[in-house]
C-alpha cells in the first residue's frame, strides 16, 4: 500500500477525552475514530489489525474442529424469552419493534440462535459433539462506555457454542478450547493469565476467564503468593478462619450509639476491632423477597456469590423504607435479632469466628453487645458470601493472597443444559431414548484484543505491534523526490517485498522526513527500510526494527533476503511462546 493512497489521518495529540494509552494511540495512529459515546469507526489500518486478530482466532477454532457460521444480528423477544434473557438483560439490551410491532433486540450474544440452529438440524447422538462459532458484531447498552473500544456499545466478538451428550465430551471440548485460547493470545503476542470465574448471566457450571494484567483493567484478580490458585474476585474463595472456641454467658446489652455511621466509628466507640462486629445488610431480590445477610464487620459482601446462592436472581440493596419496615430502624442499625418481619437470614461463614459480637439493635442509634450465634439468633442459609481481598488466606494452601487488576479478553463456560432445556432440545441416544444435550459457550472480544495488544506494546513514540497482528509487516520510506533514482530504488524494494509475501507499505508521500519517521514510529510497523541517495551512494539502505529501535546498514543487493530473515525471526519469537 502506498501511503499517498492510504487513508491514514494521524494526529500529533490525542483528543482530551482519551484517557488510557490504547485509546490515545488508536486515535493518534488512525486506527479508529470516535463517532459518539461508546461507538467507534475503524479506519483502514485498524481494519487490517482486526482482520489479523480474527484470522488467528479463526485458524485456531478451525484447528480444533469448530465450524464457522453467521447468525442474524437481530433476535426476537420470542427467541430470548424461553431462556429468561429478555427479562434478565434489562437495560443492557437494545430493544426495538419492527413494522409489525414485533419486539426485537440487537444480539448481545447468540446462545439462543445457535441452540435452535442445532436443534433444528440434529436428531441423533451420532451428530455429537458439534461446535459452531461466529465472529460477529454484538450490542450492549453499556451504562458507562469508557476506555475507548475496551467498553463500548457495539463490538466484535468471537462466540462459539458446543453441543454434547455426555459430560466427559463437554469436558474434552472445554479443555480443547482452553488450550486454543492460550495459543490464540500467545500468537497475538499477548501475555495472559487464566483464572477461575463466575458464569454470570450466561449461567452454567464451570467457568474460566483469560485476562491481561493491566492497571486499566476493570476486573480484580486474586492470586496466591505460593501456589497456582488464581480467580476473579467474583469467584475467589478464601480459607475459612477457625470457629470461635468459647463464648461467655454475658447477657445481651443494648448500647446507645448516637452519631455512629461507619464501622470505623464503631471501632473507636467500642474500642475494639471490626472483626468483633457482625454487619447485617438488607437485600431485595427480583422476585421481591427481602433477605438479611450477616457478615463479619471487616469484610464486604460479594453480591455475585449471594446472587448465585439465590439461583441467579438479581439482587439490590433494600431501600430505606423497606429497611425501616423490616428492622424498625433506619439504615445502619439492622440486626438478625428482633426483626419486625419474618425474613430469611443468610450468613457468611466468617461470623462463625466471632464470639460475643456487637450487632445493630434494630433501633435507631442502638447496638447490642455480647451476641452469639444460635443462642441469640438462627441462620437459614450459610455460605461463602464474602469478597476475597489482599491478605486473606488461600483456600488451597493457606498462604497469603494478593490482587491485581486485569482486563477480560476471553471467557469459557460449561453451560450444561440451561439453554437446551429451555428450548426442549431432545435427541435420541444409542438406546433410542430421548436425552437433553448439554452445551459449552466460549467468547473472545476482538476489539478488546486489539486494545490489549497496544496496552502491552507501546513506548513514548507510539505503538509497537507484534508482527503477527501488525497492519503491515514492513514499511519502505523514500527520502527523496520521485524524480530521484533513490525513490525508484525504494519503489523497487517495496514491489519486490510484496511479491515475495512480505506485507509492505511504501511511504511515497511528499512530506518531510521527520513527519514520515514519526508516523512510522506511531503506527508501529515492525520492520522499516529507509532509502535515500546518500546511503545508496555507499551501496546500502538503512534497516530498523521498531521494537529495538536499533538500525543497521544493509547492502542494497542483500536487503530482500535480510528482511525475509528478520521477518521469520520475529515470527519465531512469537511461535517460541506456543
UniProtKB/Swiss-Prot annotation:
Function text: Catalyzes the attachment of proline to tRNA(Pro) in a two-step reaction: proline is first activated by ATP to form Pro-AMP and then transferred to the acceptor end of tRNA(Pro). As ProRS can inadvertently accommodate and process non-cognate amino acids such as alanine and cysteine, to avoid such errors it has two additional distinct editing activities against alanine. One activity is designated as 'pretransfer' editing and involves the tRNA(Pro)-independent hydrolysis of activated Ala-AMP.
GO biological process, one term: prolyl-tRNA aminoacylation
Gene: proS
The protein, known as: Proline--tRNA ligase
Enzymatic reactions: tRNA(Pro) + L-proline + ATP = L-prolyl-tRNA(Pro) + AMP + diphosphate
Organism: Brachyspira hyodysenteriae (strain ATCC 49526 / WA1)
SUPFAM superfamilies: Class II aaRS ABD-related, Class II aaRS and biotin synthetases, YbaK/ProRS associated domain
E.C. no: 6.1.1.15
Domain notes: Consists of three domains: the N-terminal catalytic domain, the editing domain and the C-terminal anticodon-binding domain.
GO cellular component: cytosol
One Pfam family hit: tRNA_edit
HAMAP family for the chain: Pro_tRNA_synth_type1
Amino acid at each position: 500500500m502506498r501511503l499517498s493512497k492510504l487513508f491514514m489521518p494521524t494526529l500529533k495529540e490525542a483528543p482530551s477525552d482519551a484517557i488510557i494509552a490504547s485509546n490515545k494511540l488508536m486515535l493518534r495512529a488512525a486506527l479508529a475514530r470516535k463517532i459518539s459515546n461508546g461507538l467507534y469507526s475503524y479506519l483502514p489500518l485498524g481494519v487490517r489489525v482486526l482482520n489479523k486478530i480474527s484470522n488467528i482466532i479463526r485458524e485456531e477454532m478451525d484447528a480444533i474442529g469448530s465450524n464457522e457460521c453467521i447468525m442474524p444480528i437481530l433476535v426476537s423477544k420470542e427467541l430470548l424469552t424461553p431462556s429468561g434473557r429478555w427479562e434478565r438483560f434489562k437495560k443492557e439490551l437494545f430493544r426495538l419493534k419492527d413494522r409489525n410491532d414485533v419486539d426485537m433486540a440487537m444480539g448481545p450474544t447468540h446462545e439462543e440462535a445457535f441452540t435452535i440452529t442445532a436443534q433444528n438440524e440434529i436428531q441423533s447422538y451420532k451428530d455429537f459433539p458439534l461446535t459452531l462459532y461466529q465472529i460477529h458484531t454484538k450490542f450492549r447498552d453499556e451504562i458507562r462506555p469508557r476506555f475507548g473500544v475496551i467498553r463500548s456499545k457495539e463490538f466484535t466478538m468471537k462466540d462459539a457454542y458446543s453441543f454434547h451428550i455426555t459430560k466427559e465430551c463437554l469436558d474434552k471440548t472445554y479443555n480443547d478450547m482452553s488450550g486454543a485460547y492460550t495459543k490464540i493470545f500467545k500468537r497475538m503476542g499477548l501475555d495472559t493469565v487464566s483464572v477461575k470465574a463466575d458464569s454470570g448471566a450466561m449461567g452454567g457450571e464451570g467457568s474460566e476467564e483469560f485476562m491481561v494484567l493491566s492497571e486499566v483493567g476493570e476486573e480484580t484478580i486474586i492470586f496466591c503468593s505460593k501456589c497456582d490458585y488464581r480467580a476473579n474476585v467474583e469467584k475467589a474463595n478464601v480459607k475459612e478462619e477457625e470457629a470461635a472456641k468459647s463464648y461467655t454467658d454475658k447477657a445481651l446489652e443494648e448500647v446507645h450509639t448516637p452519631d455512629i455511621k461507619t464501622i470505623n466509628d464503631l471501632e473507636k466507640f467500642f474500642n475494639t476491632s471490626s472483626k468483633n462486629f457482625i454487619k447485617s445488610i438488607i437485600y431485595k431480590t427480583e422476585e421481591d423477597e427481602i433477605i438479611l445477610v450477616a457478615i463479619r464487620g471487616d469484610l464486604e459482601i460479594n453480591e455475585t456469590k449471594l446472587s448465585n446462592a439465590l439461583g441467579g436472581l438479581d439482587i439490590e440493596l433494600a431501600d430505606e423504607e423497606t429497611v425501616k419496615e423490616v428492622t424498625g430502624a433506619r439504615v445502619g442499625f439492622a440486626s438478625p435479632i428482633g426483626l419486625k418481619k419474618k425474613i430469611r437470614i443468610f450468613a457468611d461463614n466468617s461470623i462463625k469466628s466471632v464470639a460475643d459480637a456487637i450487632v445493630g439493635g434494630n433501633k435507631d442509634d442502638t447496638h447490642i453487645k455480647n451476641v452469639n450465634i444460635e443462642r441469640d439468633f438462627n441462620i437459614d442459609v450459610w455460605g461463602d458470601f464474602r469478597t476475597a481481598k489482599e491478605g486473606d488466606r488461600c483456600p488451597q494452601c493457606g498462604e497469603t493472597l494478593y490482587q491485581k487488576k486485569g482486563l477480560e479478553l476471553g471467557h469459557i463456560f460449561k453451560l450444561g443444559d440451561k439453554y437446551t432445556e429451555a428450548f426442549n432440545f431432545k435427541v435420541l441416544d444409542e438406546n433410542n431414548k430421548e436425552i437433553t444435550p448439554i452445551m459449552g459457550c466460549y467468547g473472545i472480544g476482538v476489539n478488546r484484543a486489539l486494545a490489549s495488544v497496544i496496552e502491552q506494546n507501546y513506548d513514548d513514540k507510539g505503538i509497537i505491534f507484534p508482527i503477527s497482528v501488525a497492519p503491515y509487516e514492513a514499511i519502505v520510506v523514500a527520502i527523496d523526490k520521485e524524480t530521484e533514482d533513490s525513490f525508484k530504488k525504494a519503489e523497487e524494494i517495496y514491489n519486490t517485498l510484496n511479491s515475495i509475501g512480505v506485507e509492505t507499505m511504501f511511504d511515497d508521500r511528499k512530506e518531510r522526513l521527520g513527519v514520515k519517521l514519526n508516523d512510522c514510529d506511531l503506527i508501529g510497523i515492525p520492520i522499516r527500510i529507509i532509502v535515500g541517495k546518500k546511503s545508496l551512494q555507499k551501496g546500502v539502505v538503512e534497516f530498523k526494527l521498531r521494537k529495538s529501535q536499533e538500525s543497521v546498514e544493509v547492502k542494497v543487493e542483500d536487503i530482500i533476503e535480510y528482511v525475509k530473515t528478520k521477518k521469520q525471526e520475529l515470527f519465531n519469537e512469537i511461535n517460541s511462546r506456543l
